[in-house]
């Protein structure tokens, strides 16, 4: 017969005294760890897979395997339920102690309507008073400002363009007429205003004077042509 296994004496020294021995790398959740997990129990159905459960709950397949101590994908059907680890934020662990501080911060950032409303009404009164002093008419909140109409049809645009072209043609023709009528008079006034031109008009054309130099130059040209 097999001998019964020995049990350690109560109160003895060793690894099993007061706590369970764990190997290196075991999944131990530390009390000081800021990341905590909340496990959700899922009833397995015939069409469930690890990938589908991971997508459904927003976790990874490795986390589901680690939480249920699974080593293959086919072993999930050996169990009726699976534990899905869901991470919880660290501030949820304070049991609402920091909720009052958050509310106070929100009240400081977002003031109440009773504090904002008087400032807005005073600003509107100042703007209306300045507009009346300058003679400007400010629109009331219920009244919309009339928007100027700038949209023209194609026919109106072409008519406007034709009228502008005709006006520019008339102005150019008038300028040409004024130039043709005014140039001869101006030239005559310029010619008569100068004393040299007046003297030339009275005496007539000035005859060319023949000097000895001109004669010698002409004789040299004749000799060149003869050669």
Curated annotation (Swiss-Prot):
Positions modified as Phosphoserine? 23, 33, 99, 166, 194, 212
Specify where the region named Disordered lies, as residue ranges.
Answer: 1-22, 97-150
Q: Which UniProt keywords apply?
A: Phosphoprotein
Annotated LysM domain residues: 40-84
What InterPro entries does this protein map onto? LYSM1-4 (IPR045030), LysM_dom (IPR018392), LysM_dom_sf (IPR036779)
Composition skew (Pro residues), residue ranges: 1-11
**Gene Ontology CC annotation, any one:** nucleoplasm
This chain's protein is named LysM and putative peptidoglycan-binding domain-containing protein 1
User: Which organism does this record belong to?
Assistant: Homo sapiens
State the organism's lineage.
Answer: Eukaryota, Metazoa, Chordata, Craniata, Vertebrata
Q: Which gene encodes it?
A: LYSMD1
């Amino acid at each position: 017969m097999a001998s019964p296994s020995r049990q350690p004496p109560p109160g003895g020294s060793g690894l099993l005294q007061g706590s369970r021995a764990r190997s290196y790398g075991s999944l131990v959740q530390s009390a000081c760890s800021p990341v905590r997990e909340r496990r959700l129990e899922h009833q397995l159905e015939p069409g469930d897979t690890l990938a589908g459960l991971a997508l459904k709950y927003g976790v990874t397949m490795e986390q589901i395997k680690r939480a249920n101590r699974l080593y293959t994908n086919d072993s999930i059907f050996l169990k009726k339920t699976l534990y899905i680890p869901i991470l919880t934020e660290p501030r949820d662990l304070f049991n609402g102690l920091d909720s009052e501080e958050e509310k106070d911060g929100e009240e400081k950032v977002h003031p109440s309507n009773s504090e904002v409303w008087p400032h807005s009404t005073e600003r509107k009164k100042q703007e209306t008073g300045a507009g009346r002093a300058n003679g400007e008419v400010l629109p009331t909140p219920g009244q919309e400002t009339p928007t100027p109409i700038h949209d023209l049809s194609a026919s109106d645009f072409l008519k406007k363009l034709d009228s502008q072209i005709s006006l520019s043609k008339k102005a150019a023709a008038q300028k040409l007429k004024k130039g043709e009528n005014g140039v001869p008079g101006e030239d005559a006034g310029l010619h008569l205003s100068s004393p040299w031109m007046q003297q030339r008009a009275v005496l007539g054309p000035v005859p060319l004077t023949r000097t000895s130099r001109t004669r010698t130059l002409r004789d040299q040209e004749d000799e060149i042509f003869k050669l």
